[in-house]
Amino acid sequence: MSINCLPAARLMLRPLPPFTIMARRPVIVVAGLACETSTFSASRTEAPAFHPRRGDEVIEKYPFIQPGSPLGEAVDWRGALIGHALPGGIVTRNAFETLSTEIISRLKDITTSVALDGMWLDIHGAMCVEGIDDAEYQLLKHCREVIGPDVLVSVSMDLHGNVSRELAHQTDLITCYRTAPHVDVSETKERACRNLLELINRRNNGEAFRPYKAWIPLPILLPGEQTSTRDEPAAHIYATVTLVEASEGVIDAAIWVGYAWADEPRNRAVVVVTGWDKEAISSGAEKLARIFWNAHKDFKFVAPTGTFTECLDIALRSSKRPFFISDSGDNPTAGGSGDVTWGLTQLLSRSEFTDESGPVVIYASVPGPGAVDKAVEAGVGAIITATVGAEVDHFHAGPLTMTRRVHAIKHGDHHAAIEIVLQVGSVYAIITKLRKPYHLEQDFTELNLTPRSSDIIIVKIGYLEPELYSMAKDWMLALTPGGVDQDLVRLGHKRILRPMWPFDRDFEEPNLSSRIIEMSNEKLTGF
């Protein structure tokens, strides 16, 4: 079986609205917290995991608003606090309150010194917090209590986020990525900022400045591994987004797939279209909702699937190298804890890999802080006995003890802190101080590994990120256990709204009509 190397969804973007530099530059504050969190993961996310940036550090994060850029010159940007954590388990209540309280405090300081025109909220949209539903709405609501109803708010999100009616109400503009894998991250955020500036300019010119918002929820909740925009039907669905956006009277159009590994009532697919023409945004939203719903039974996994054993058997028989296998159930970039040892345990039990002359396999990765410390002390080439994994998630397999040679040591990684490689027969197992995603070729080559000449590469990931996708000569998605198990039904969701596809297979067609959400300075009424 070979990979169907379809290009990423082509972005058909209309020119962004023009903006002007006014005598007094408008003031826009930047804030946000982002963490994609699985409620089925045993791990917990604490405040340091967000790597918070404050003040000028916030502005430095985004090249398109820095001094010298068009937006940087047109706006007086003020940084409050942003924090982007690696996906993981539920955010602790203390972490959320610590960070959100600091955001509120910084907003108070900023609003005391200058009048705000706008706020850009940069979030993911799938953050779950202990004891709190709809955390992003709660965050924005508290921000609104400080900045007031007159400040215009633009929100940028991941398409795997969730948009409740309440969150949509608190915003004036809301958009999300249009590609998965996400190759339009910066573009999306810049669009959110440019459109916000356009609203501010319209207000200063005496024009209507609060757009209408058409919101349609859909009873669909699918994983990213079935909704990649590389493949159909997502490719043509997301191509339609830009066509709707190009319609007269429309500012922005967006489809959120939603986040499948969290058990909250808000979790589902959503369409939002914003603009000046109520009829245009309503019909545009309904067009997107209809095309999405009509295709809901057509979504399939982005690669051939199988059990871990089946994937290994097929990879060994294949002549295509390197052959990639996604150990999908513990994917740390989807919310898995990252320290499930089930896959590595299964791999090392195979006789094909016990000898160093066997097929070369790279496995990425399992955290093992103690093993890392031992390797660092012993040095490259030393033989050590070390135990790794299952410190957080031991439900599927216990800690794994190995006596093997240290192949490589690397210090200073942003996510992992320290990485080591242990050679176990013909398997090169990457062990980390802290969990880390492996998305780039250099993630391997910097560890003295040669992925392009390896036989099999097993990565805790779902769909392959672009560099890995282009490197792979073949690929399978192993349906393995963990906090982001691709078998959604066996996870046991209890709080999502029902019926919901694919949890329920037969139900009446949902209401696909647009709901016009009240403007942010109006009271939210109705259902």
Predicted regions and their residues:
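Glycine-rich anion/phosphate-binding loops
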Residues: 90-104
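Short acidic, glycine/serine/threonine-rich loops at helix termini
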Residues: 40-44, 91, 131-133, 164-169, ...
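Internal, active-site/partner-interface "lid" segment
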Residues: 200-235
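Hard-cation-handling environments
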Residues: 225-425, 430-434
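Glycine-rich phosphate/diphosphate-binding loops that line cofactor/substrate pockets in enzymes
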Residues: 15, 21-25, 107-117, 311-323, ...
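Extended hydrophobic packing segments that form well-structured cores
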Residues: 79, 97, 101, 293, ...
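N-terminal amphipathic/basic leader segments beginning at the initiator methionine
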Residues: 8-9, 13-71
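Active-site histidine-anchored catalytic micro-motif
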Residues: 29, 33-34, 42, 50, ...
